[in-house]
Regions:
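Short, charged recognition helix plus adjacent turn
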Residues: 81-117
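Short, conserved catalytic or interaction motifs in soluble domains
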Residues: 57
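Helix-turn-helix DNA-binding elements, focusing on the entry/boundary residues of the two helices
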Residues: 27, 38, 49, 64, ...
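DNA major-groove recognition helix of helix-turn-helix/homeodomain DNA-binding modules
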Residues: 65-86
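Short alpha-helical DNA-recognition segment
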Residues: 35-54
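C-terminal regulatory/oligomerization modules of transcriptional regulators
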Residues: 107-136
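A short, Lys/Arg-rich alpha-helix, primarily the initiator
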Residues: 4-33, 125
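The alpha-helix within a helix-turn-helix
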Residues: 31, 42, 72
């Protein structure tokens, strides 16, 4: 249950399920959960409130890596790796790209690329990836 403080509604960041979110809506939820106004965040990242509002409302694409990292820093998400990863994942999904926080690693790792290409054509590859994730 969200709590209120000075008429601002907060939700626990861990309770945000990103599967039901678009990037902008998720960003807005995180920003509001942190109690930061759109004007303050815009000032902190050197953008206009209108620009950020357009992102939150789905009128602009998610920001590129550098700006997204700045937003994450200004939202003080260092203690929320799941939320950070979700922001990168949703931004990448809407851009039809690889998440920016892992792109360089994936592209520089030939073994990983070979494994991904092999797995994508295999039946039950989701189960294989789940087992790999458990091992790691």
């Amino acid at each position: 249950m969200p709590k209120k403080d000075n008429n601002i509604e907060f939700v626990a960041l861990d309770s945000l399920e990103y599967e039901v979110f678009e990037f902008g809506k998720y960003l807005r939820s995180v920003r509001q959960a942190k109690g930061i106004s759109i004007r303050q965040l815009a000032k902190d990242v050197n953008k206009t409130p209108t620009y950020l509002s357009d992102i939150e409302n789905g009128h602009n694409k998610p920001p590129e890596k550098e700006l997204l990292e700045t937003i994450i820093q200004k939202l003080n998400l260092d203690d929320s790796p799941k939320v950070k990863a979700t922001l990168f994942d949703l931004a990448a999904k809407e851009r039809n790209d690889i998440p920016a926080d892992v792109k360089d690693y994936i592209m520089s790792n030939q073994t990983l690329l070979r494994i991904i290409r092999t797995a994508k054509d295999r039946p039950n590859s989701e189960q294989i990836w789940s087992q790999i994730a458990k091992t790691i």
